[in-house]
Every structure is written in structure tokens, then in C-alpha cells.
From Swiss-Prot:
It comes from Methanosarcina mazei (strain ATCC BAA-159 / DSM 3647 / Goe1 / Go1 / JCM 11833 / OCM 88). The gene is hacB. The record marks R29 as: Critical for substrate specificity. InterPro entries: Aconitase/3IPM_dehydase_swvl (IPR015928), AconitaseA/IPMdHydase_ssu_swvl (IPR000573), IPMI_Swivel (IPR033940), LeuD (IPR050075), LeuD_type2/HacB/DmdB (IPR011827). Keywords: Lyase. This is Methanogen homoaconitase small subunit. It catalyses: (2R)-homocitrate = (2R,3S)-homoisocitrate; (2R)-homocitrate = cis-homoaconitate + H2O; (2R,3S)-homoisocitrate = cis-homoaconitate + H2O; cis-(homo)2aconitate + H2O = (2R,3S)-iso(homo)2citrate. Pathway: Organic acid metabolism; 2-oxosuberate biosynthesis. Belongs to the LeuD family. LeuD type 2 subfamily.
């Protein structure tokens, strides 16, 4: 289930962070989420998984999640404890894969430094950065917010199906 607003410490990355950096290909044969978590961002910061704490937030530049369409990339970040990703832009398939697994994200161009505390309000489409102000982002459409609130696509479809069963009974 999604919390809102999402508050956390920033991990800052640049432009064109591809899925090979997020979770290197040599780990894709496993289905163990702890393996994914242990190797998240290994291609750019080998110690990331040991330093990241549950509730941390990634802030990045343009085209976050580009490259191959591996769904393991957002899974690795989610299981490493990342609560949200804010980027200037996302690769479309990464964006949808993140929504599908219930990993909140927002497109926004914000000013912050690694280690800053930020607050991401998905319902308002804004990010507050301690000591630096409030930045407007792209508010997600309601149907995507509903999916995130329910924990992702599968959980959302189950909820809708259960509601439909109740209504028809």
C-alpha cells in the first residue's frame, strides 16, 4: 500500500540510468528478491544496497530506467527499500513496470543534493525539499494513483474483481 506523502532521504543519480546499471544482467536468472535487492544500482554504486535504507528516495535526471525492458529493475529498487523515484523523465517501459509492481514515481525537475530530506506528494503532484522549497511535478492520472494505492496492477485488479463480485451478489 502506498503512503502519501512519501518522506525520505535522497539518493541522487544523473541522466540515462539504464536497467543494466539498476540490476546487472548476471543476476536475472534468479527469482529471489533479496538477490535483486543486494545488487540494486551495483553498476553505478557497488555499495548502494548496503547504504540504502527503507524509505529512501531516488532522484534522477532524464530517461531513468532506459535500456532493456527487464521488469527486475524496479523490483530490485523496491526490494532494496526505495520508497519512490523522482526523475526529470522515465523510460516508458520502466515507468509502467514500476507502477505495475506498486513502486511510486513522479516526473519532476527538482533541486536537491544527495542526503537531503524530501517529501513527495503524489496526490498534489509536488515535491518539498527541506530548505529549498516546493517543486511542481507531473501528477499521475487517477487510475495510476489507484493502482499504486492498491499496491500495483495485480492487487488493483484483484480489488476491482472483488468489488464487482460484491456488486453482482
Amino acid at each position: 500500500m502506498m503512503e502519501n506523502p512519501i518522506k525520505g532521504r535522497v539518493w541522487k543519480f544523473g541522466n540515462d540510468i539504464d536497467t543494466d546499471v539498476i540490476i546487472p544482467g548476471k543476476y536475472l536468472r534468479t527469482k529471489d528478491m533479496q538477490v535483486f535487492a543486494a545488487h540494486a544500482m551495483e553498476g553505478i554504486d557497488p555499495g548502494f544496497s548496503k547504504k540504502a535504507k527503507p524509505g529512501d528516495i531516488i532522484v534522477a535526471g532524464d530517461n531513468f530506467g532506459c535500456g532493456s525492458s527487464r521488469e527486475q529493475a524496479p523490483l530490485a529498487l523496491k526490494h532494496a527499500g526505495i520508497a519512490c523515484i523522482v526523475a526529470k523523465s522515465f523510460a516508458r517501459i520502466f515507468f509502467r513496470n514500476a507502477i505495475n509492481i506498486g513502486l511510486p514515481l513522479m516526473e519532476a525537475d527538482i533541486e536537491c543534493e544527495e542526503g537531503d530530506q524530501i517529501e513527495v506528494d503524489l496526490l498534489k503532484g509536488e515535491v518539498k525539499v527541506s530548505g529549498k522549497g516546493v517543486f511542481r511535478g507531473n501528477k499521475l492520472p487517477d487510475f495510476l494513483l489507484d493502482m499504486l494505492t492498491d499496491g500495483g496492477l495485480v492487487a488493483h485488479r484483484k480489488k476491482v474483481r472483488d468489488q464487482e463480485k460484491e456488486e453482482s451478489a
